[in-house]
Amino acid sequence: MKVTEYIEKANGSSLISLEILPPLKGKGIGALWNHLDPLMECKPAFINVTYHRSESMFKRKADGTFDKVEVRKRPGTVGICAAIMNRYKVDAVAHLICGGFTKQETEDALIDLNFLGINNVLVLRGDAPKNEAFFEPEPGGHKYAIELLQQVTNMNNGIYLEEDLKNAVKSNFCIGVAGYPEKHFEAPNMHSDILYLKAKVDAGAEYVVTQMFFDNQKYFNFVQACKEAGIEVPIIPGLKPISTKKQLNVIPRTFHADIPEALSNEIMKCKTDEEVEVVGTEWMLQQSRELKAAGVPVLHYYTLGKPNMVCNVVKQLM
């Protein structure tokens, strides 16, 4: 079932969804089940599986010189989506990114997803490679998320890269995109960022999932601004638990999300990571309760290695 169909069927009730990372290369499927098994108590409507571009590494050759090689540390998104749907009978949402993929590779991935009956995708530009300041597309790939989105909508209309294909099968993907309650860090201002989001919705995006935030008012303001811009698709809030003091610096730097002073003050008082987890869980619980009371369509949790914290919150919401 499509994400939008789940939302429509819920008839105003807030659903639960989860987001996971693929296991590192070399890890077996058991690593995924160990992460997901406890999370299934949350009764998620769907589970997002991230996609990551390859990273450049230098490997020493026998003569002492180095070769630059591209290594994908977390492969397997398409296979993991299929495995999740087979084991748990829960729909999976495959992330698609521009970075590191050609248009042909993207089309091949979409064909695989379509064959497997995975009908939900989240299209993203993706980040710049590590140690590089700016995003550069793969030769023959997409530079912007809206271009990737248009490729998916083309396939939904039976239009493939090989234009001479006759009577090509139409795919049936439900397409989500990302939204930024604190604006995308590359956008000059919030207004221009929302206009770009509106362009993606006009191009076929059916729902929005936000970047993590820790101040609900920023989400409410974002939703209102989107409505004023004519964006009428569901806007799903993304939530993440803080579990270590280190994240007070890592999250703003990596995800460009502010951490409220009240939250950071409480975390700084903690002497152990266990104490931080208690504070982080309570904060996310209060966020979740307020958002649920406001009638958000879905509460989307970035689990990122902390399934127990998410489970604790969801159990108290049930």
What kind of feature is each model-predicted range?
Residues 1-49:
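Conserved N-terminal beta1-alpha1 strand-loop-helix module at the mouth
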Residues 15-33, 91-104, 174-192, 268-282:
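Active-site mouth loops of central-metabolism enzymes
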Residues 19, 47, 113, 200, ...:
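Conserved, mostly hydrophobic/aromatic
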Residues 42-75, 129-140, 205-221, 304-310:
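Glycine-rich, proline-tolerant flexible connector loops at the mouths of alpha/beta enzymes
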Residues 102-115, 192-196, 221-224, 244-250, ...:
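Catalytic cores of alpha/beta
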Residues 103-150:
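Flexible, glycine-rich active-site loops centered on histidine and acidic residues
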Residues 126, 139-172, 177-186, 193, ...:
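Active-site pocket-lining/capping segments in soluble small-molecule metabolic enzymes
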